[in-house]
A protein has these predicted regions:
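Flavin-dependent oxidoreductase catalytic cores
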Residues: 1-382, 386, 391-397, 401-402, ...
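Conserved acidic residues
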Residues: 55, 159, 246, 308, ...
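Flanking helices and flexible, charged tails adjoining ferredoxin-like Fe-S electron-transfer domains
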Residues: 201, 365-374, 397, 401, ...
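Short beta-alpha connecting loops at secondary-structure transitions
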Residues: 258-264, 285, 308, 415-423, ...
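A short helix-to-beta-strand connector/capping loop
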Residues: 306, 438-445, 479-483, 552-554, ...
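Rossmann-like dinucleotide/flavin-binding elements
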Residues: 377-407, 446-454, 458, 466-475, ...
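N-terminal Rossmann-like dinucleotide/flavin-binding domain of flavoprotein oxidoreductases
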Residues: 413-459, 567-593
Length: 673
């Protein structure tokens, strides 16, 4: 064991069983849970993380009955047949040396089907169905269903269960005055509102006996109006412990909350102090979670606070060998999760199978295999952006001899720009990872080298990952000195105090955030909490207060040609954060805009097909974020020389900057070579 992380890598004795370290792979729905035919893929997915050293794995959520389904016919643990099927998962994890819990999750009013139930018949703002009020008899049946699901999990070979009581699902709905308007034994007083989850834990313990882990995932800060008070939260923790819980896991925010808790702009370890405060009131281990992604931070948390375990879900998607690398003194080789959500949670919330932007093998362990090549080939990769880096590293990992050409002085491509956006500083970790891997696998990196046909002749395979160039729209005055590309704006060009941003896609939102922010709140937890109104839960019910955003550094206009709301194509789980942030920073968003001309006075615009309401935006600068064009100027020359290049990333498709697609294409190509 390395001395760098002595607490993180130390075992935890639970009395009847021992966890090999303090690392928990937190629950995340992958989409593989919902179909019986995907059970082998799910087993392989978990087994790879167990082989990578994770101490305790928690599955995605399984409903204890049909009203608890997230979707019709979604994942469930209600029958002996379900339990038998899950033996493949538990056997695979145990053979790899790990332990695994089944999460039991009742969606309540978050269910996407007309049979949903809740504490009261109050519709969720994020689902189309109004739930039916669960009757007193229905409450009792649901408690028994949780206990039955836990018994089935034991039959399936699970080491325990996690009872999902946070994130606004059914148990949380009973706990909060916001959603529980009952006046019977299951509502009214705080004690009655707690009765439902506490009774679930008690009856579950009776059903499974003493030698079985029961982890209760509790909401430690709801971040919604009329959420739980601190006294209620502490009382729940102590009562859940008394009812038989082994572990207490941390949850923060409901899915409808307007305080972000998981996106990359949330400061690292933002909620650890809350988990530690709860831990002071209980005698069972408390698990810290949310925005913890590197072993140095995890070790510090365990050393400085009262928590005893660290839960990380997305970091284990990004790098299944996270624990092994930390234990071997190779933390610099960890493919650090950047909390982008683009291939994981954004997929989950539109009911697609989950993967990882940085690791497209996640969830595809049985189909996307990077095994040793039978015949090493000389491979040239042109372009060191995300696509080229993934292709180069993956090909070299398989045993190919790889040369990487990059016209610029550094690797990273669009990630080198993205890391400068407030809230995206961690994108630099991806560049660090690839820099390390290029060296580890012996890739010959040629910076400041614009490869031509002559340089590429003689390679067995040539990969064009030459990326994109900003598209220049046809606007009179586009050559005016006050006009900047988004790359120039982000890279340090002098910019005035009033700016128009042309193009309201993802790049336009990022550039606007860059322009209105002097210092990133992601790097200052106090400022971030003030901006979002995230209160100390010990001082405010629901952990909410009035947001106090920092004053914008500049006056910014964000413009788009199309009508309608801006940012509709942003990520499902992060788009609302970007929109809310720009609104708080007083960015003026204008849609249906015609760009008439740019001159010394500023940007002249009008609106609609009839070019109505002409006006002048008297701005100091105009930043162009109007899309990209593929850079493929090498292709024709290569083909003329008899070389058929592989084209990936932005060089293949430039409609949107899409690192998810780029890294996936690079990895898949390397697997085929």
């Amino acid at each position: 064991m390395t001395s760098e992380y002595p607490t993180l890598l130390s075992p935890l004795d639970l009395g009847f069983t021992t966890l090999r370290n303090r690392v928990v792979m937190g629950s995340m729905h992958t989409g593989l849970e919902d179909r019986a035919g995907d059970i082998n893929a799910l087993a392989a997915y978990f087994a790879e993380r167990a082989r990578g050293g994770v101490g305790l794995i928690i599955t995605g959520g399984y409903a204890p009955n049909r009203t608890g389904w997230l979707l019709p016919f979604a994942s469930q643990m209600i029958s002996a047949a379900d339990a038998r099927r899950h033996r493949r998962i538990t056997d695979a994890v145990h053979e790899a040396g790990g332990k695994i819990l089944l999460q039991i999750l009742h969606a309540g009013r978050y269910a996407y089907h007309p049979f949903s139930v809740s504490a009261s018949a109050i519709k969720s703002p994020i689902t189309p169905f109004r739930p039916r009020r669960l009757s007193a008899r229905g409450v009792e049946r649901t408690i028994d269903d949780f206990a039955h699901a836990a018994s089935l999990a034991a039959e399936a070979g699970y080491d325990g269960v996690e009872i999902m009581g946070s994130e606004g699902y059914l148990l949380n709905q009973f706990l909060a005055p916001r959603t529980n308007k009952r006046r019977d034994a299951w509502g009214g007083s705080a004690a009655n509102r707690r009765r439902f989850p506490v009774e679930i834990v008690r009856r579950t313990r009776e059903a499974v006996g003493d030698d079985f882990i029961i982890c209760y995932r509790m909401s430690m800060a709801d971040y919604v109006p009329d959420g739980q008070s601190w006294d209620e939260t502490v009382a729940l923790a102590t009562e859940v412990e008394a009812a038989g819980a082994t572990l207490l896991n941390s949850g923060f925010g409901w899915h409808e909350a307007r305080v972000p808790t998981i996106v990359t702009s949330v400061p690292n370890s933002a909620f650890v102090d809350i988990s530690s405060a709860v831990a002071e009131h209980v005698g069972i281990p408390v698990v810290a979670s949310n925005r913890i992604n590197m072993p140095q931070a995890a070790e510090q948390i365990l050393a400085d606070t009262q928590v005893q375990l660290i839960s990380m879900a997305r970091p284990m998607l990004a790098d299944p060998d996270w624990v092994a690398k930390a234990a071997d003194g190779r933390a610099h080789e960890i493919n650090t999760c950047i909390s982008c959500n683009q291939a994981c949670l954004d997929h989950a919330f539109v009911h697609k199978k989950v993967s990882c932007l940085l690791n497209p093998r996640a969830g595809r362990e049985t189909t996307l295999v990077l095994g040793p090549t039978r015949r090493a080939r000389n491979v040239a990769v042109v372009g060191a952006g995300p696509a080229g880096l993934s292709a180069a590293v993956s090909a070299a990992q398989r045993g190919h001899v790889v040369t990487l050409f990059e016209a610029g002085p550094v690797i990273g491509g669009q990630f080198d720009l993205a890391k400068r956006i407030p809230g995206k500083e961690e994108f630099a970790e991806t560049i660090r990872y690839y820099t390390t891997m290029l060296d580890k696998y012996g890739v010959s990196v040629r910076l400041n080298t614009r490869a031509g046909v002559a340089e590429l002749t003689g390679f067995d395979e040539v990969v064009l990952a030459t990326g994109v160039a900003p598209r220049i729209p046809d606007i009179p005055g586009i050559e005016h000195p006050k006009v900047l590309s988004y790359a120039q704006a982000i890279s340090g060009a002098p910019i005035g105090k009033s700016v128009a941003v042309i193009g309201a896609g993802g790049v336009g939102f990022d550039v606007s955030e860059f322009l209105v922010t002097d210092a990133s709140p992601t790097l200052n937890l106090k400022e971030w909490k003030a901006e979002w109104g995230a209160a100390d839960p010990q001082e405010a019910r629901g952990a909410l207060t009035t947001p106090i955003p920092a004053e914008p550094a500049r006056e910014v206009y964000l413009l788009q040609r199309s009508k309608g709301r801006q940012g509709t194509r942003l990520g499902k789980t992060s788009g609302w954060v970007h929109r809310a942030s720009l609104k708080a920073k007083k960015v003026q968003q204008l849609s249906g805009v015609n760009y008439e001309r740019i001159d010394d006075a500023g940007l002249h615009i009008s609106f609609g097909p009839d070019r109505k309401r002409p006006q002048l935006l008297a701005v100091d600068n105009v930043v162009i974020c109007a899309g990209q064009e593929s850079v493929r100027d090498l292709e024709d020359g290569l083909r003329a020389a008899g070389i058929r290049p592989h084209i990936i990333g932005g060089a293949a498709v430039a409609a949107e900057l899409d690192a998810k697609r780029a890294i996936k294409q690079g990895t898949e190509l390397a697997a085929r070579l």
